[in-house]
């Protein structure tokens, strides 16, 4: 008898496993580093924060915030954090990581096998091609900033089952980890340089992170509207 296990170890959903024990702590009890970056989501008066060095490994976390189901996602290769409603055609859906396309994480829904881009929630292959997941507004800020803005908020804690995996992303926030995929080009406008992306009325534009950090703000016009991009250099809290 011959068994073939080719590529099993390198399948995305085997390399990056879902959370087993999701624990949320009140900000008063949270002992994490105030400088850690988080993705923050607020729904119906309830705010929750998800440290990037945790969800960066899992790539997605399903949660309920303010009575709403939310799928919080993060791609460590392109540094994109997005949140979506995991409801497809009126029914709750679950997803698994299947790989990446154009350096962005790709998910597959469990009901139809369709493939969805993490960067914008667009289905690009399968029976649901062309469908978009409903976006849930989210913000990136430090743990400390979240605590100041949301004193009744909750913060996701490390899952003890993945301590070793989280350790591999310990330098990710600062952009100092050595990796061809997750590493950072510190110069501007290189393949792995940091940018702030803005989408408005169907138009998209990217702004150089280094320039924004030097100036603190950028004023521009997009789709005929004036926009202001500003950053808090202490908390890495960007506002658009």
Question: Would you name each region that the model predicts?
Answer:
Residues 1-240:
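Mid-to-C-terminal functional-domain signal that highlights helix-capping/loop sites
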């Amino acid at each position: 008898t011959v068994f073939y296990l080719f590529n099993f170890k390198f399948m995305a959903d085997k390399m990056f496993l879902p959370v087993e024990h999701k624990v949320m702590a009140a900000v008063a009890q949270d002992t994490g580093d105030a400088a850690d970056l988080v993705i923050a989501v607020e729904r119906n008066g309830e705010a929750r924060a998800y440290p990037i060095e945790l969800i960066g490994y899992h790539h997605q976390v399903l949660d309920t915030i303010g009575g709403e189901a939310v799928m919080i996602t993060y791609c460590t290769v392109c540094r994109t954090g997005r949140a979506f409603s995991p409801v497809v055609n009126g029914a709750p859906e679950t997803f698994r990581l299947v790989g990446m396309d154009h350096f962005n994480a790709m998910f597959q829904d469990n009901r139809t096998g369709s493939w969805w881009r993490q960067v914008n929630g667009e289905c690009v292959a399968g029976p649901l091609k062309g469908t978009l997941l409903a976006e849930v507004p989210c913000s990136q800020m430090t743990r400390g900033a979240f605590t100041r803005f949301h004193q009744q908020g909750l913060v996701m804690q490390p899952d003890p089952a993945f301590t070793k995996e989280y350790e591999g992303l310990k330098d990710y926030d600062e952009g100092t980890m050595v990796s061809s995929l997750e590493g950072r080009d510190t110069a501007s406008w290189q393949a792995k340089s940091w940018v702030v992306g803005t989408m408005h009325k169907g138009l998209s534009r990217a702004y150089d992170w280094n320039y924004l950090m030097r100036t603190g703000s950028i004023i521009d016009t997009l789709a005929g509207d004036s926009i202001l991009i500003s950053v808090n250099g202490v908390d890495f809290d960007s506002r658009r």
